[in-house]
């Protein structure tokens, strides 16, 4: 994706809908019907898509793109991911403590002592809550829960987020580590 400097995934194209070139699209925007409000959408292979029509359907939006005029052309788009440039996202609508998930990528994850656990390489939602992927030099990627207990502070200007490594599952709690599920009380 050479055209975009800081791409943000906005949608994934699904199956064709009807005969006029419409496609079912899974939009990752707050308002799925506003997908076209962010400007042209770009694919990883460099194609540009302009939204002509959009309407809501069950769990998706149905979109007609410029230049996609028949079912065959629409079917060829199945599975295609669509991106915009990060600068096209409206920052002025955000509160002070709000951010876009795309802004988290690249932040260094540190604990309160400053020890680094790598940087954020992705944000995922597999249905049970958001997860941050951390990757450090020479380390395998790990997923940590994106919760208020695991991520204590986010500082976009400093380029870091402060985590609790125990709550994030990166280190064992000395009191209740493996083989010791609960601290025992002695009489």
UniProtKB/Swiss-Prot annotation:
The keyword Chaperone applies. Keywords: Chaperone, Cytoplasm, Ribosome biogenesis, rRNA processing. It is found in: Cytoplasm. One of its GO terms (biological process) is rRNA processing. It comes from the Bacteria. An accessory protein needed during the final step in the assembly of 30S ribosomal subunit, possibly for assembly of the head region. Essential for efficient processing of 16S rRNA. May be needed both before and after RbfA during the maturation of 16S rRNA. It has affinity for free ribosomal 30S subunits but not for 70S ribosomes. PANTHER family: RIBOSOME MATURATION FACTOR RIMM. This is Ribosome maturation factor RimM.
């Amino acid at each position: 994706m050479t055209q975009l400097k800081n791409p943000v995934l906005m949608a994934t194209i699904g199956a064709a809908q009807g005969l006029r070139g419409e496609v079912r699209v899974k939009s990752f925007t707050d308002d799925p019907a506003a997908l076209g409000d962010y400007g042209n959408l770009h694919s990883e292979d460099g194609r540009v898509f302009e939204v002509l029509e959009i309407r809501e359907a069950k769990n998706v939006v149905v979109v007609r793109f410029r230049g996609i005029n028949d079912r065959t052309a629409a079917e060829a788009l199945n599975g295609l991911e669509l991106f915009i440039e990060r600068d096209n996202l409206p920052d002025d609508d955000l509160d002070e403590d709000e951010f876009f998930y795309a802004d988290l990528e690249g932040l260094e994850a540190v604990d309160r002592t400053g020890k680094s656990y790598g940087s954020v390489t992705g944000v995922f939602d597999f249905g049970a809550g958001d997860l941050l992927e951390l990757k450090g030099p020479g380390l395998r990627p790990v997923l940590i829960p994106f919760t208020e207990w695991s991520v204590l502070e986010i500082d976009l200007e400093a380029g870091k987020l402060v985590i609790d490594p125990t709550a994030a599952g990166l280190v064992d709690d000395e009191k209740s580590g493996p083989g010791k599920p609960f601290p025992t009380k002695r009489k």
